[in-house]
Amino acid sequence: ATEELKEFFAKARAGSVRLIKVVIEDEQLVLGASQEPVGRWDRDYDRAVLPLLDAQQPCYLLYRLDSQNAQGFEWLFLAWSPDNSPVRLKMLYAATRATVKKEFGGGHIKDELFGTVKDDLSFAGYQKHLSSCAAPAPLTSAERELQQIRINEVKTEISVESKHQTLQGLAFPLQPEAQRALQQLKQKMVNYIQMKLDLERETIELVHTESTDVAQLPSRVPRDAARYHFFLYKHTHEGDLLESVVFIYSMPGYKCSIEERMLYSSCKSRLLDSVEQDFHLEIAKKIEIGDGAELTAEFLYDEVHPKQHAFKQAFAKPKGPGGKRGHKRLIRGPGENGDDS
């Protein structure tokens, strides 16, 4: 959060503000708008909240009630994620939600509401929320929190472009050039594919399919951007010549933005599902790296063919007693009893 927003939060908690709108700009939480109280909280609600809900842009709203607890005035936390907003924005706002609550002070927040259409966050919508919470066998606060998290994770609209979010990941559609490259890899017409996410168009784009050998592979990995790579790894193993498709996800750490890291990680599993199921390409190994220098010939071989560890015998023969000992004699010889006879 910016210093301006932190200072405004401190001022607002004193009670002089009715509503705070928080948005994300340049990966920072900033103050979007604010309003002062006019009348009672229930009469101010729709007039203050509804005009600030943009049909394309998610946001967070903090709405002050007139009730107080030990820490001061109580607030509602409203998370707005409209159906028509880009999927990447929905994910970014969902991932930052806990940070906003922490910056404001969770002890001041009495209740939370999530909405994708204005009716969800209207005063009538809040009344329905209160009624459901007061129904028989109410959920505990922990259960309500878990339920809200699950709703946030799956409540993303599926669009005609087939990009959609599920608990298993996010799917951006493959552009035609990328699809053709995968077909060529299956037919072994190319041996290397590099792909990237187009964050604006929300698609997976082909970067290039330049012929690549193991020695060249490290130089194909950008040092300042994430990429997906498919490599036809030709090698010998136990006397056999093999051609194994290896998937490499390269993410150069914190040189990439939070949004980029989040989207690449989330899209990865759905991309691999599509490659294996739709293009019938068997992925021999899936590798994640931070630097191209990791892709040595030895590293690739060990990843595709992990060394087998030998196991010790489960029941080892017990060891004998230590030291050198002769056989124990059970019968004494003459004169050993102390008799002279």
UniProtKB/Swiss-Prot annotation:
Residues 1-131, 169-305 form the ADF-H domain. The keyword Protein biosynthesis does not apply. The modification Phosphotyrosine is found at residue 301. GO terms for biological process: actin filament depolymerization; barbed-end actin filament capping; cell projection organization; positive regulation of neuron projection development; regulation of lamellipodium assembly. Keywords: Acetylation, Actin-binding, Cell projection, Cilium biogenesis/degradation, Cytoplasm, Cytoskeleton, Phosphoprotein, Repeat. GO terms for cellular component: actin filament; myofibril; perinuclear region of cytoplasm; stereocilium. SMART domains: ADF (SM00102). One of its GO terms (molecular function) is actin filament binding. InterPro entries: ADF-H, ADF-H/Gelsolin-like_dom_sf, Twinfilin. The modification N6-acetyllysine is found at residue 6. Phosphorylated on both serine and threonine residues. SUPFAM superfamilies: Actin depolymerizing proteins (SSF55753). It is found in: Cytoplasm, Cytoskeleton; Cytoplasm, Perinuclear region; Cell projection, Stereocilium. Residues 314-341 are annotated as: Disordered. The modification Phosphoserine is found at residue 341. The keyword rRNA-binding does not apply. Actin-binding protein involved in motile and morphological processes. Inhibits actin polymerization, likely by sequestering G-actin. By capping the barbed ends of filaments, it also regulates motility. Seems to play an important role in clathrin-mediated endocytosis and distribution of endocytic organelles. May play a role in regulating the mature length of the middle and short rows of stereocilia. Interacts with G-actin; ADP-actin form and capping protein (CP). May also be able to interact with TWF1 and phosphoinositides, PI(4,5)P2. When bound to PI(4,5)P2, it is down-regulated. Interacts with MYO7A. PANTHER family: TWINFILIN, TWINFILIN-2. Belongs to the actin-binding proteins ADF family. Twinfilin subfamily. This is Twinfilin-2. It comes from Pongo abelii (Sumatran orangutan). The lineage of its organism: Eukaryota, Metazoa, Chordata, Craniata, Vertebrata. The gene is TWF2.
